């Protein structure tokens, strides 16, 4: 029902508020206590009513029901002809927001915001335009003599001034019906008289005033007095001298109402502002709450970054096997019973057949042996590898000095050798450039024509053992006397799928040999294995780090539950001025999300600091590489933690009973 419809009902002879047979009971353990007994009363538009009674008489309970803060156990209560008995909480909030204004004995102002912002709170929930909201709040405060106090917080105001702010707040959305609970109870006599006069003036302007008091002198100021005792109305009479005004207050909220979306954004900003104020008011507690999130996010991001760095380092070392290579090795697959009878199956011709394929860039045959190598008076065991002219290309090795093998080296079976850095240090520790020096390999001399760059951590040769390379034809004929090779490495075109090339080479070799007396190793499969293994390890360690996040989330939930308890009175005030359950839930959920997002950002910053430290201290051994995916995931994760672990406290806040919330300090 719109404001216009409600006013139309009020303009007729129908009562503004009507109570019939109202009963209110409360549970006290296993007992049921009846506070109000068969209450019947009618209040018309523009009346000034005083409900008087001693403490425990039920007058405040009746006021709470009349103000839609509470609902009757039985009976009927109508406002503007509309029954409120079966209205849900948000529908009751709408009535409070658009038609009721509350003046409390203890003022119930929000301590962290200014007088202007306190007065504006009801209009935020009503969807009033921001500029109009501020202008009206300032005008109301000015009309009540507080023009110079609009920016003051409640702690900077006297009791009388705080009560005036409370009155201005009650009028913010129009305040058709003003409910005043002991409005002068906490004031000195002068301030009390001023407040009573303000209420009379408001009544003269057409506002319906309902005061709850135990003071007969205050009740005597009203047009009508309702006496209540032990939950029963014992008297209902009028003061004959009181002149009832005929005017009606204009509806304020309909003139400046925003769109539904604009109103939602306003409420969102209000929730955001209040969340920041709450966080600022408890800085240390907020920081400690964030700590679990900070550590968890930093751990996850650092572990993922370290895993990524390790993976990249390992994969870069695979370049020693070639960028995209397939190695064919002599012998039946492991576990095949034929393996023990025939292991000499690969020939240089097999390597050449593979080299002739269009998807193969180059091939290097290979065979290996361990032999004694001597240079002058230095003799050591070394690994000897016979390789093809394209070995440097397929292996990814690079020369530090000298040259590699060429076609003539293979055809003429030259006794040229290439040594690695270990052999250089072992046999020529004092010779910077050993090119041209001669080593004795067994009984065969070999002339050094090249030295390889150090390849620490690579996969092709031992880190410590000296390794010498010579043309495979030289090794076959001069060192081991064999017509067979142990393996060959094929460098595959990067535009070709390595799995397709592997299948094609397998088919070719099977066709040539008539059987599968060979084994194939794909460097890409090694890469995939390393990637999957690294990912699994990263996931495992991240799972442990995520436990910290969960603990941090539980910490957020605990602190938010404490915050809800501490701010119960604030929640009650917001509900009294018309906040929906969703508004309350939104406010506390935003606070939890803000704590987690801020904790997540600090955690990401800490992870960057840890990564920088590791990169500086670890050198080439450890590298932390951050990806945008992990950072975005961490940010999203911290947000989700705020939503998940902030939901329960936010829901508890939204489900609070307004009357119970207002009664707590």
Curated annotation (Swiss-Prot):
GO terms for molecular function: ATP binding; ATP hydrolysis activity; transmembrane transporter activity. GO terms for biological process: response to antibiotic. Its main location: membrane. It comes from the Bacteria. Keywords: Antibiotic resistance, ATP-binding, Cell inner membrane, Cell membrane, Membrane, Nucleotide-binding, Translocase, Transmembrane, Transmembrane helix, Transport. It is found in: Cell inner membrane. Part of the tripartite efflux system MacAB-TolC. MacB is a non-canonical ABC transporter that contains transmembrane domains (TMD), which form a pore in the inner membrane, and an ATP-binding domain (NBD), which is responsible for energy generation. Confers resistance against macrolides. Homodimer. Part of the tripartite efflux system MacAB-TolC, which is composed of an inner membrane transporter, MacB, a periplasmic membrane fusion protein, MacA, and an outer membrane component, TolC. The complex forms a large protein conduit and can translocate molecules across both the inner and outer membranes. Interacts with MacA. Belongs to the ABC transporter superfamily. Macrolide exporter (TC 3.A.1.122) family. This is Macrolide export ATP-binding/permease protein MacB. It comes from Psychrobacter cryohalolentis (strain ATCC BAA-1226 / DSM 17306 / VKM B-2378 / K5). The lineage of its organism: Bacteria, Pseudomonadati, Pseudomonadota, Gammaproteobacteria, Moraxellales.
């Amino acid at each position: 029902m719109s404001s216009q419809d409600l006013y139309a009902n009020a303009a007729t002879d129908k009562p503004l508020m009507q109570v019939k047979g109202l009963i209110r009971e409360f549970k006290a353990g296993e007992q049921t206590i009846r506070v109000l007994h068969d209450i019947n009363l009618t209040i018309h538009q523009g009346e000034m009513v005083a409900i008087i009674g001693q403490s425990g008489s039920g007058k405040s309970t009746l006021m709470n029901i009349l103000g839609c803060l509470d609902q009757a156990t039985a009976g009927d209560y109508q406002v503007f002809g509309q029954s409120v008995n079966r209205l849900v909480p948000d529908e009751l909030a709408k009535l409070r927001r658009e038609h009721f204004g509350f003046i409390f004995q203890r003022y119930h102002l929000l301590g962290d915001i200014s007088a202007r912002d306190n007065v504006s709170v009801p209009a935020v929930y009503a969807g009033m335009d921001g500029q109009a909201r501020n202008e009206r709040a300032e005008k109301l405060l000015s009309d009540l003599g507080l023009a110079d106090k609009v920016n003051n917080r409640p702690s900077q105001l006297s009791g009388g001034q705080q009560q005036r702010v409370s009155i201005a707040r009650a009028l913010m959305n129009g305040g058709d019906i003003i409910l005043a609970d002991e409005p002068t109870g906490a004031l000195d006599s002068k301030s009390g008289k001023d407040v009573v006069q303000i209420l009379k003036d408001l009544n003269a302007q057409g506002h319906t005033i309902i005061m709850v008091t135990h003071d007969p002198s205050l009740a005597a100021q009203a047009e009508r007095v309702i006496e209540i005792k032990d939950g029963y109305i014992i008297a209902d009479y009028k003061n004959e001298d009181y002149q009832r005004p005929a005017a009606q207050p204009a509806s304020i909220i309909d003139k400046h109402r925003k769109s539904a979306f604009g109103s939602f954004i306003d409420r969102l900003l209000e929730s955001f502002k209040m969340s920041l104020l709450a966080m600022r008011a408890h800085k240390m507690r907020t920081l400690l709450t964030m700590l679990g999130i900070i550590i968890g996010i930093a751990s996850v991001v650092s572990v993922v970054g370290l895993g990524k760095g390790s993976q990249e380092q390992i994969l870069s070392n695979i370049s020693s096997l070639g960028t995209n290579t397939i190695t064919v090795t002599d012998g039946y697959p492991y576990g095949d019973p034929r393996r023990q009878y025939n292991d000499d199956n690969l020939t240089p011709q097999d390597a050449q057949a593979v080299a002739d394929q269009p998807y193969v860039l180059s091939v290097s045959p290979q065979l290996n042996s361990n032999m004694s190598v001597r240079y002058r008076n230095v003799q050591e065991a070394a690994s000897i590898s016979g390789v093809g002219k394209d070995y440097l290309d397929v292996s990814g090795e690079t020369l530090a000095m000298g040259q590699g093998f060429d076609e003539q080296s293979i055809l003429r079976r030259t006794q040229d050798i290439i040594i690695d850095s270990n052999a250089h240090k072992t046999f020529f520790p004092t010779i910077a450039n050993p090119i041209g020096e001669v080593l004795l390999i067994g009984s065969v001399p070999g002339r050094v024509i090249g030295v390889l760059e150090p390849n620490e951590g690579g996969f092709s040769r031992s880190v410590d053992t000296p390794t010498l390379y010579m043309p495979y034809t030289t090794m076959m004929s001069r060192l081991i006397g064999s017509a067979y090779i142990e393996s060959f490495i094929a460098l595959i075109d990067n535009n070709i799928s390595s799995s397709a090339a592997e299948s094609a080479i397998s088919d070719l070799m099977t066709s040539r040999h008539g059987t599968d007396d060979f084994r194939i190793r794909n460097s890409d499969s090694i890469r995939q294995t390393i990637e999957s293994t690294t990912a699994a390890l990263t996931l495992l360690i991240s799972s442990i780090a995520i436990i910290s996040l969960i603990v941090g989330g539980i910490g957020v939930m605990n602190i938010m539950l404490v915050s809800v308890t501490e701010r119960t009175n604030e929640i009650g005030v917001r509900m009294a001025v018309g906040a929906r359950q969703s508004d309350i839930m939104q406010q506390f959920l935003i606070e939890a999300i803000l704590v987690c997002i801020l904790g997540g950002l600090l955690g990401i910053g800490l992870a960057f600091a840890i990564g920088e430290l590791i990169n500086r201290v670890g050198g080439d051994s450890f590298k932390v590489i951050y990806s945008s995916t992990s950072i975005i995931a961490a940010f999203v994760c911290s947000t989700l933690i705020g939503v998940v672990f902030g939901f329960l406290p936010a829901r508890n806040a939204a489900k609070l009973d307004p009357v119970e919330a207002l009664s707590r300090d």
